[in-house]
């Protein structure tokens, strides 16, 4: 019997590169990121996440001024970066 991959729960993993970026963020942004990732695990399509695909990567909003990036493999998301919207715009040009 084949299982439907869309019925599997979404799994989310933060890579070392993500945690390196996270540690460099101001504490208030870290707290906001924590809140957003809890929400992502509950409902990845929640409007406040702004979760969308940009080429080969997925992006999520962390407040108005920050973004996080992930790559998808099956139903798993691997978060590899988080930072300012300005840095996101520059990085997105390279990873799309």
Where are these regions (language model features)?
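A short, surface-exposed loop/turn module that caps and links secondary-structure elements
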Residues: 35-62
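Tryptophan-centered motif/residue detector
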Residues: 19, 37, 58, 79-81
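Amphipathic alpha-helical interface surfaces
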Residues: 18, 29, 36, 62, ...
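Alpha-helix boundary/capping residues
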Residues: 25, 36-40, 95
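Enriched for short, Lys/Arg-rich terminal
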Residues: 1-13, 62-96
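Arg/Lys-rich, positively charged N-terminal/basic patches that mediate binding to nucleic acids
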Residues: 1-35
């Amino acid at each position: 019997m084949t299982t439907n991959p869309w019925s599997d729960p979404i799994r989310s993993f933060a890579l070392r590169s993500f945690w390196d970026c996270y540690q460099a963020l101001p504490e208030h942004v870290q707290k906001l990121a924590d809140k957003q990732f809890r929400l992502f695990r509950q409902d990845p399509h929640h409007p406040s996440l702004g979760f969308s695909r940009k080429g080969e990567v997925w992006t999520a909003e962390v407040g108005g001024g920050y973004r996080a990036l992930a790559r998808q493999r099956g139903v798993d998301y691997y978060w590899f970066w988080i930072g300012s919207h300005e840095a996101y715009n520059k990085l997105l040009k390279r990873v799309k």
